[in-house]
Amino acid sequence: MNPVPATCIRIERLSKTFRGQSTPALQAIDLAVAEGEFVALVGASGCGKSTLLRLIAGLEAPSEGQVCLDGRPVQGPGCDRAVVFQDYSLYPWLNVLENVRFCRSLRAHTRDASESEVNSAVERAYALLELMGLDEVRTRYPNQLSGGMRQRVAIARALMAQPRVLLMDEPFGALDAQTREVMHELILRLFEIERSTIVFVTHDVEEAVYLADRVVVLAPQPGRIDSIHPVALPPPGARHPDLKLAPEFLRQKKTVLDRIRATSGVQRDLDKLSRLAELSRRDRRPDAKPATGTH
């Protein structure tokens, strides 16, 4: 019997209301994320996915409740958490290697790191560049790279500090479909090697089910957890693109998508359109009686 993983992130009664807003962006969120777990957050626009990620990162302060990492309340950003955003956030004046090493180099300068620590950081940087397929472009600058390559640099930089938690906010949303699929395989390989705990925000249900151990559906206005879906598929490290065609994968994708539609009002709108289409078909029948008004 495998031991139960320890809880890495615990979110308790977490709420966030932004200044000038009457409706909370998030309300009464309770969630536990296990050590080494990959959790995806999905939901309609405005459900608070990115806000929840920023609260875990310590980039926003909660209005109520708390986020705990290893039992300690999150008070702000920390080296135990790294964030990858959709817009890459690379330093344009630094080349690939310098971008990857930046945060680790800054820490070394501020606390007078030993020679062995510096050497270890250099070795890790080169290892990450090789793992991410960046070793041949390490002297190039961000404006000389494709979107997919820039996101690889951002992920490598996030992993340099060996964070306990990797937070990813729509990291592949701006990439074309082919590049996104390549990045899926890359992130699964990294997850298997690094074993970081990952919280991943996406609007793509197929992406969420393919990558994650669990998918959390958030409902909007106010943002709250609607449902949590364990992914009953091979573990993330053993998944392959062909899995997306498997009946069980398609069933789980539909289950999550149905919940998003239900919470966002999309299904209600689709039902109205179906009713309108039926009325239109009926009115076009030869034997249909014209509608009459009351005077």
State where each predicted segment sits.
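Helix-to-loop junction immediately C-terminal to a conserved catalytic motif
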Residues: 57
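Conserved ABC transporter NBD signature motif
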Residues: 65-77
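Conserved ABC ATPase signature
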Residues: 141-145, 149
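The feature captures the beta-strand-to-loop junction immediately N-terminal to the Walker
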Residues: 42-44
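A short, flexible loop at the N-terminus of ABC-type nucleotide-binding domains that lies
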Residues: 2-8, 16-28
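Hydrophobic anchor residue at the start of the ABC signature
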Residues: 84, 155
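Conserved ABC ATPase "signature" region
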Residues: 101, 105-108, 113-137, 189
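A short, proline-enriched helix->beta-strand linker immediately N-terminal to the Walker B motif
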Residues: 160-164
